[in-house]
């Protein structure tokens, strides 16, 4: 209905100033309108007769309202009505007036923005009504609405709050933000709204006016007052303002509440009205631009755009934007739009495209960057009616524009004056833009963390002369914290203290709201009115008004400032401005979308782009002038490469390399120029604790940026450098020194038991460097690595007092800073350690920082960064004392104050919060790791000085391995030094306890987790900690008795038959011809050494493998013993190569000689290489000799040089035999008995000369002989035993000690005769000469000799062994010329005789001669001869009992012990693989193992599969080892006293299931109930003899061990059968055959461990997601510190308790994560499965996914598809049909197998990946994962890897990973290089596939939950 506006002024009316203003106002309204337009609604003001109180009437159209004169005119809104009211607003006002006349309450509903509020205020201004305004937030409670208690003079009073005041005084109550209030708070008002009645806390009762007036007729006012009845004014009205909730977030309206309001939709102003308004503002802007701008904005507010998920455009900010454009008409509009609506950081890709489309549609795209503001040119101060302003000149394009902006009270500084601020181009531009916004509105600055927002804001404030008020916001901040807090006055009265924000508003400061993205939107709502209207109502009833409104009020009421302040009305300073700082919203995530439609209306947004590289270099260079240039360039190109990658992993790494962090690194580099950049970066990223994916991505990127680990830093630095020392007031740690602090408070300096070790000293040195640079430190590490100890030691050395504070779950911001407590009714604050440390300059140690919620620890940021912090009692901490000048309540930070924060590493299994992620970049981070083995050993020695060294070494090694398993994620618990130290302390105190029982103190935690237990036991066994062994499990070889010795006769020297005494042999001397050196590559490989005595004690004490090719053949081994180091050399001959290793070390080395030994021309060439290690001074050099080609090589293993030595005899060797000559190839031999003395002897078989090679002198001596040689034994240095080839006649060659070059020394050859004992008649029995296999080159000691031949004797002797005798001793040989006696222990039958027949069939031809290796050693120190025999030569019947089948072996070690006259046969386990060349093998040795001496009392064997084993054979040594071993196990079987074991004495009958108890009561013992605990025979937990475990959920009572052991066998068997039956039953239920069950078990069992650990992590996630929160304002629970005062006043709801937090209002449903596994089921998988089992591994991986995610469907939804030649989308597991049991899972595995068997060939990896990525995003989910398994031979199908890389990263929402199953050659690794880091894996070994999957899950999926 159209109405007319009339203006009728009664002449001479005295309506007072108010009515005069109203008339003027209405007159203006009318004058603006063109006359004669009669279709408009009108507002009229009518006067009644002169002087009447309620004289004036307001008419809006046909609705009129009588004005009343307000009692408190200062409460009437001022200055809200604008000159020209838009038609739509007039319509709204008319409607409100109608409702007002009806006495109804109204609800103005509509989109966010100030419009609804301003309409309400305009109405109230028009009708002269007093207003009570309350902004509801989630912190509003009943007391804020009704009555609050205050204490006055020791008595609690009730003070009426807004609703009650409004009702009694007849004001209008405006409730803003109903959707913000928590549920069930507002119903308090229901009755007041409906019946105008309310019961108050103080006993009064509000009653509606009509009823009150009725009562008043019958009763007097006095009576009613005595009944405490109060009249509600008939003028009381409520206006509620709210958002429509389904569209915006918030709590929906309560139906009873809703029904009490009349609603009116207040949408944005209509297009025309809005356009008119904008035209009036922006006179300089072309009309076309304005209308385009408005059209754009209106489009984005339409229904369609909200269905796209775009937030509403803030239409209300348009006026401000047009105001800027009015001053800068040349500025592109698109640019201004970005400020109002920062769509580029707010929206995902699709949203951006939509907005860009609308921009194009309205031709707003033309943003020439040349028209953007460039910089601020100058700033001048000016005063305009007492308001300080600045005129700022901004250069835009090439014009300069001057604008007026509000300024602060301090002096202005020119834009580039600050020395701490470095101007870069983008920053200048940003400042200019901020200046433009500052002209009209508050600013919100958005930028990543550490990019300099605070610095920019501060510089901006300096430029305009503002004082800054930084306010750090945190997550659980309440509205009270923002506005006013309660405190007590000294007399005990309660009062309100204004917050810094309110003070700043009054004083005209610039407020920095730091971290506005953290605060709950419901809390920020209280600031809306301050930001939009510059008005604020506080809790204590005071009101802050905008300055012009305040002035108007002052002038109208003719009051002074003091009088207004008495009425608690204050002006807001016109210069007051807010700058909010925030981190960009997380695009696409539901949880972190703080930038909503409501927020958009409050600020102008400026995005602070990360610095570009050149600018960042400029900043760093100017801040740190002498930073090394090269390092800086590398660092920045690396960082920017990370920042530009889309990959989330790279992004998170880049986040920890913020500008702030780069500056820190640069400062350190400039201070310590030889620092290593690699370690600086890894330290900043804390790479030690990154998930494995992120770590590998970081390593890859570092390698690409050529940032290497310094190789010249030797891994173990010089030990002498690293120590801490204090000299004359200076502390030196390593290379860094610092002055020692002079502490006042000595008792606060920590003093701690600390044993220095190198690694901790290095950490402390590193800390000291940063400490001296003024950094605050953050130490991150696993538990028990000594973080606290290091810090205490560090402070002790520096002599700094420390304050200690430990955080935990319930730490709040208040408890961090102050502890409030009540004393005598006053509230008193006690300083927390933090404040004390700040005041006194102590070091604050914050322990367990990751346990507190991150929203609490955030407040440390401003303290560390800016040195500012506000305390709960109103004091503030400031950094520089210059700012203090006379302000009270200020604490200045002491210059010596520092913070050291300790936290556990982020991520599983530590259930802390990610402290490092949120605050890592403001501290200097140090990763503290467990000490390296030798540091740890050093430390443990000090903890356990009496603990035997080997035990410490074992512990260190075993724990080292466990830690590396924890790093790989195979086990969850990271074992730390703390655990080892505890073990060592125990052993130190109780030395008799066995190690294996003491380690259980640590490992019993894991005893119920079978997978974990298995890993632990294996690891401990590997290092020889015999956990689980019993003292009785000793399994030494059985001893057989040696036959009696027999006297064999004499060896006599000389007296040749011909009568010749001796033969002389001439000698020639030559120099060696040396070729070379050639540098040779020596590869290192790790040794996995297993201590073998884990479960039982045997002769074998350790073993390890060398990485041998399957076809390779070991042909010789040798050991060298140099100063305590035993080195083992192993030579192989196909191809020729050498392995050598220190027998105690961690790594071995490998040299390949394939291309060095010459291949001879004849077809079949079987090289045979022997090795001789040389001794000191040629330590580390070895001589290698090939027997057929007689090539001699000298290899220097330390210098990596190879020489070839050419002997003179070689120069004229006979013609080479070709394959058609059937003659035998020649064989050359090397005698190496004295190689440790650096000389060797070479001879040719059947040759007649010997060549002595003296390596040290570089000479050879050739001795010519009159005989042809068969073998040579060097029995002493100067006496050699020779055997002639045809007759086996022995000779003794003596040579002078040193053959001189003159040739004077001549060698003499004697015949050696073996004479049998004389039979008395001169008849000698003929003996066949046997060739010894081995003759010792030294003699037995005389005790050994005496006990061997059983007569006291001292004489030279040699011990030898041959095929007929176990051992032979020759007494007197070789030094005495008299006949030597020969004693033998004869074998029952000769060796090698039997083997001739039975091997001839399966080894091909008959054996040619004897094998080349005799495998025989003499151990003189233990009086033993040791050799290896094939099983056929061993008396197995004597060793093993009848019914035992002998094990498969590589051979037996035969130990002939002449001391105890015993024989032992020790089996060598058979080798895992054998070379297929069996004939070749048989020429080398007749067993599959070779033997050498290990040390004085043991031997080493190497089998043909490359397995090296160390054996102890000496009896004394074995006895000693057995003692140690028994000590390690401890005496578990000692009987303890005071134990009373009550045996129940009952027998066990047959097992049964037992009765099920209907009430499920716990049953203990008895013999009846099923599911009981601890009974016998019935199924249950922990009983004896029960059939299977049945858990009814009660505590378990254990039957004592002895009783368990007493269960008879047949009962056990029955129990097992019953268990079997239950299993059968389960199979039957899911219809699975046993064969199927076994098949499934094959796949499932292989991944059980991974499934298990994944499920543990998933469970923890579930738990973490379900973590309870603190619920405030509770009536029961723990006292909430923030509400102590409310408690004093006697309020009820002052407690807090833990509870499930309601999901935040309007926050969307948590969606599950989506995973799609794309597996390769192509034909090649089936085809190559035989080679590497890839198909089975893939099936295992699928099985793992299905099992791990079972029952987590609401968190993770997965489906599995396959790709093959048949297609790219073969459904295996659809999302809605997840397999439920093993049978269904097996079906899926079978399908995979069958598919790959029968599908077409071809490859659809790319299509499959692309399709999966496209499809998966179609459904909404929290996160998307696509994992592709493929054996893609990409090049074969012509697919370019770059194409694949592009597909993997095509959608930033999807985390896509590819796992390639190792294909041919290095193809897979090449592929990985082209694919993005951390996104692709190569599983060369298919066993890794499940492992890799597990890695992906743990490091990505779980990181973000």
Curated annotation (Swiss-Prot):
SMART domains: AAA, VWA. In fetal eye, it is highly expressed in the retina while expression is low in the cornea, sclera and lens. Residues 1543-1560 have a biased composition (Basic and acidic residues). Residues 1-28 form a transit peptide. ATP binds at residues 447-454. Residues 1542-1563 are annotated as: Disordered. One of its GO terms (molecular function) is ATP binding. Glycans are attached at residues 284, 855, 1096, 1142, 1833. It holds the Pfam family AAA_5. Residues 1-261 are annotated as: Interaction with PEX7. Keywords: ATP-binding, Disease variant, Glycoprotein, Mitochondrion, Nucleotide-binding, Peroxisome, Retinitis pigmentosa, Transit peptide. GO terms for cellular component: cytoplasm; mitochondrion; peroxisome. Transmembrane segments: none annotated. Residues 1714-1896 form the VWFA domain. InterPro entries: AAA+_ATPase, ATPase_dyneun-rel_AAA, P-loop_NTPase, VWA8, VWF_A, vWFA_dom_sf. It comes from the Eukaryota. Monomer. Isoform 1 and isoform 2 interact with PEX7. Isoform 2 interacts with isoform 1 of PEX5 in a PEX7-dependent manner. It is linked to Retinitis pigmentosa 97: An autosomal dominant form of retinitis pigmentosa, a retinal dystrophy belonging to the group of pigmentary retinopathies. Retinitis pigmentosa is characterized by retinal pigment deposits visible on fundus examination and primary loss of rod photoreceptor cells followed by secondary loss of cone photoreceptors. Patients typically have night vision blindness and loss of midperipheral visual field. RP97 is characterized by onset of night blindness and visual field defects in the first decade of life. Exhibits ATPase activity in vitro. This is von Willebrand factor A domain-containing protein 8. The lineage of its organism: Eukaryota, Metazoa, Chordata, Craniata, Vertebrata. The gene is VWA8.
